From Swiss-Prot:
Assembly with partners or alone: Component of the gamma-secretase complex. The functional gamma-secretase complex is composed of at least four polypeptides: a presenilin homodimer (PSEN1 or PSEN2), nicastrin (NCSTN), APH1 (APH1A or APH1B) and PSENEN/PEN2. Binds to proteolytic processed C-terminal fragments C83 and C99 of the amyloid precursor protein (APP). Interacts with PSEN1 and PSEN2.
Protein's name according to its UniProt entry: Nicastrin
Signal sequence extent: 1-33
Tissue specificity of this protein: Detected in brain (at protein level). Widely expressed.
Membrane topology type: Single-pass type I membrane protein
Topological domains annotated Extracellular: 34-669
Organism for this UniProt entry: Homo sapiens
GO CC, any one term: Golgi apparatus
Gene that this polypeptide is encoded by: NCSTN
Amino acid sequence: MATAGGGSGADPGSRGLLRLLSFCVLLAGLCRGNSVERKIYIPLNKTAPCVRLLNATHQIGCQSSISGDTGVIHVVEKEEDLQWVLTDGPNPPYMVLLESKHFTRDLMEKLKGRTSRIAGLAVSLTKPSPASGFSPSVQCPNDGFGVYSNSYGPEFAHCREIQWNSLGNGLAYEDFSFPIFLLEDENETKVIKQCYQDHNLSQNGSAPTFPLCAMQLFSHMHAVISTATCMRRSSIQSTFSINPEIVCDPLSDYNVWSMLKPINTTGTLKPDDRVVVAATRLDSRSFFWNVAPGAESAVASFVTQLAAAEALQKAPDVTTLPRNVMFVFFQGETFDYIGSSRMVYDMEKGKFPVQLENVDSFVELGQVALRTSLELWMHTDPVSQKNESVRNQVEDLLATLEKSGAGVPAVILRRPNQSQPLPPSSLQRFLRARNISGVVLADHSGAFHNKYYQSIYDTAENINVSYPEWLSPEEDLNFVTDTAKALADVATVLGRALYELAGGTNFSDTVQADPQTVTRLLYGFLIKANNSWFQSILRQDLRSYLGDGPLQHYIAVSSPTNTTYVVQYALANLTGTVVNLTREQCQDPSKVPSENKDLYEYSWVQGPLHSNETDRLPRCVRSTARLARALSPAFELSQWSSTEYSTWTESRWKDIRARIFLIASKELELITLTVGFGILIFSLIVTYCINAKADVLFIAPREPGAVSY
């Protein structure tokens, strides 16, 4: 009689089912991991880190350890509160939270000296701005990279004559071994302080009990020592690795430039072609990465120049002027004149349509929004004027400016002491290459009026830009502020002076800057970039560059930046003309016989809103507004230790974030670890035993045997 066959081992199907169940349990655990993390940690989403920057000689900025730095939060509201952090507190390291008004050099020096007890620093942005001023920049900006040196005006080198930024404390140029973050959201700051009060506040001087509120900051930087070191490492990686790990990038972007009369950009001007240069800077910075409002240090001046360019372009005889005018907006001037030094380099090498020998005169706008008694100061270089020819040219330049200012009562042009040097300015880089007649227009005769130079406080409030509370955002956009009127007056003086410097004689009085243009530009750059006017002047694919807040003017390493694009398109729309081309023709004008891409740039912009206020009327704008590379020549030449050109780089990083959570005592952490380890061992033993006895525990049911007849 036949019998049914049966196996003594575990059924493979049962083992497969066991593996499937184990996988499902593991997957469920992973899926629940994020949920558990959200219950433990509160992420801080509106923060700005201090990052590491490097140059030819050293590194500045901040960083955390590779796994982030964690510390018990302690709020410092007055100087005495530091004692707990530096000596008395029993649970170091501490994460210090302080209001921005306490963010001073003296306090930072104390923290820097006790790094074993400091995990990091969180700075809450508070208002109003410190009345005494705050500037983390140095007192002599761009020292060593301007025109003055031991061989050229040694008495003016290193700001021996004038400390231009007298309030500068140099914090932004220090190196800190712990992370420092700016808290930009007031609500997040309140959450942190509430957590501190609930868990960390000591009673009667005694130590608080666990759990304690802690903060963790991640900002580990990949680059170290200097630009030469990090660029060399990146170069080696790029040469020998399939997937190179770049550790730093040069600070770079694009200069924005345009010509009053179009020129062929595929060649260079003839030697006898004369060009008047009107220049200003686009960038600023602060202690924190990509927080650079730059209202007085940058925005007011480039807004004024945009308005002057618009006014000059409307002059009736602009196409017949004997000399051309070039408007230039330099990027990276904060970091040792990146933009201007690159343009001078390209001019010298014949890589730019305008050559140095074509420059007839140079008019630069410095800081111009904080004038006192209506005064605008005309700064010149005393050293180059030792040459009689240059002195006569400068005298003619100043006389032209004074004549132009005479028709604008709201602007009083003044000459500082003739032996006074130039303030930090792009003109200095041109003077290093060639003696030219130039002037820098500024609201200060000596040290800066700007108490918040290159700081988080150089905002709209610093230049008195404010709006009535009852107005809507659209009404704010078109509300002409007193600051806009004042800057429009300066733009009118500049426009008329440029008209006369270009050889114009008949229509100087018709050159008039529009306060409406100035107020729209100020609102867009300092209050809300995502507004109807900025939307109308940009390409559709650039809409994402417009946020609901102000634009930031840090040069960065990814380019072009938001500011660069918006300034380019603002310049194009203010000085260009709308041409009757289709979208396809605008994007490829070479197919249109009457158009010339060597002379003009063509942009298909969104245009103004249709009457139904939902659709836009796109159009093609033809202008001479272009971009030119603003990368220091040091990186073109691989001279990473250069003292001639800027060598600033920005370190790369993997993770930038901040979060708070409750931290247990060391004893409880040890107990938890021990129990967890015990459970792990027990689980492994149980798993081993089950696996060893699987043939007994998981016996497959016998199949019914075959029946014999």
